[in-house]
Amino acid sequence: QMVKGYSIIANGGKDIQLTLLRNLEQNKNQKSIISNDLSNRLKKLLINVVEGDNGTGKSLRMSGYVIGGKTGTSRTYLEGIGYSDKRFNTSFTGFIETNEGPIVGSVILWGAIGSPISEYVTGGSTAAPIFKNIVRNLVPDK
């Protein structure tokens, strides 16, 4: 559902059919779900998560590319114990713009206990770097 919503934002408000592989033909002539203006405003907010000075997704910055999305972090609930102070559910859902159109995806980690880039376990320090590695393999270098 998150990827579907972000794909509508990233594609100018158009209702895009999701696929695991690129299939540009099936997404021609799709109806608009939200206005292009609203799509552009939402896209700017999501890009600011990556490009903004205080953005929680700044670990995703890649020179020459436009990337937007949202990080997420919550404490993991452990049966019989309650919410953990050491295990976290983290995520990044977002898009990268390419010449062929945006690529939209989501990375979700359940029970994360450490971060390779920070002392804090957050969506920006765990899921976002994985998203970045995925898109690096999908898009050419600029």
Q: Would you name each region that the model predicts?
A:
Residues F92-T93, G101-E119:
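Short, well-ordered beta-strand elements
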Residues V49, T73-R75, T98-N99, L109-G114:
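Solvent-exposed loop/turn segments at secondary-structure junctions
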Residues K14, T71-S74, S125-T126:
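Gly/Ser/Thr-rich beta-alpha loop segments that engage phosphate groups in nucleotides
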Residues M2-G64, I113-G124, P140-K142:
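Conserved active-site-proximal loop/helix segments of enzymes involved in bacterial cell-wall
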Residues G123-V135:
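Short, charged, low-complexity patches
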